[in-house]
């Protein structure tokens, strides 16, 4: 499928600073795009634009050939966005968070206990998330990736706080998603340790 996700002439201004301008971007099914850049370069701002959570100062973003604004509901159903923050309900347990996502995003049934076990959270399923470590909270947050059917994933620093084993597990999950014709945009400060044949990188320059 061509024209899966395309951005044309994007500009983003924050606090009178031009983070980027005239930025073009294209993503096809099966592709992984890694956005790189120094702290403050505008990576999260770009991801938020691409997720439809904020509006560019100039340019447009098309999903399957149509502007995001005319298909907000379809785009939301096609997207799994996980931001900088974990996005979990800290008062709820891991099991309750999964039940919440399943209801909110109308996800099909799957075995939550087994999923959490495979993410190294066995025995912690019923602990309120506020009592979990940073890496464990991140694992709960990323559990969404094993549940969602959305073809487009936009992930802001998903490896933060994860140990090596969890990083490898997450990259295996990327492979499966890409093999199933999914697409991923990710920001990371470190190089991906596994080989991704479809990987492209984009560097955002820090501008004063
Ligand atoms: N909503 C906002 N209002 C005002 N300024 C903002 C807003 N969002 C981001 N900024 C500013 O835009 C700049 C880029 O922020 P952004 O979070 O996109 O950078 P980043 O490349 O993701 O950085 P990091 O690697 O530190 O996560 C920063 O200087 C930040 O202060």
Which stretches of residues belong to each language-model region?
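Conserved ABC ATPase "signature" region
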Residues: 109-125
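Helix-to-loop junction immediately C-terminal to a conserved catalytic motif
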Residues: 51
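Conserved ABC ATPase signature
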Residues: 100, 128-135
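Q-loop/switch helix immediately C-terminal to the Walker
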Residues: 85, 90-106
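Conserved ABC transporter NBD signature motif
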Residues: 55-70, 74-75
């Amino acid at each position: 499928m061509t024209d899966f996700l395309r951005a044309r002439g994007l500009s983003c201004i924050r606090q009178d600073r031009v983070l980027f301008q005239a930025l073009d971007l294209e993503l096809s099914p099966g592709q992984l795009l890694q956005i790189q850049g120094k702290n403050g370069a505008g990576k999260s701002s770009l991801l938020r634009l691409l997720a439809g959570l904020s509006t560019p100062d100039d340019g447009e973003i098309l999903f399957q050939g149509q502007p995001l604004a005319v298909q907000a509901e379809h785009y939301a159903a096609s997207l799994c966005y996980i931001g900088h923050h974990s996005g979990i309900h800290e008062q709820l347990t891991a099991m309750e968070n999964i039940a919440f996502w399943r209801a909110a995003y109308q996800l099909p049934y799957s075995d939550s206990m087994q999923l959490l076990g495979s993410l190294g959270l066995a025995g912690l399923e019923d602990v309120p998330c506020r009592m979990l470590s940073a890496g464990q909270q991140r694992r709960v947050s990323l559990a969404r990736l094993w549940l969602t059917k959305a073809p487009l994933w936009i992930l802001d620093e998903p490896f933060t706080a994860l140990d090596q084993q969890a990083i490898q597990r997450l990259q295996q999950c990327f492979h499966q998603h890409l093999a199933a014709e999914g697409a991923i945009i990710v920001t990371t400060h470190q190089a991906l340790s596994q080989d991704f044949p479809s990987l492209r990188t984009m560097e955002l320059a820090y501008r004063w």
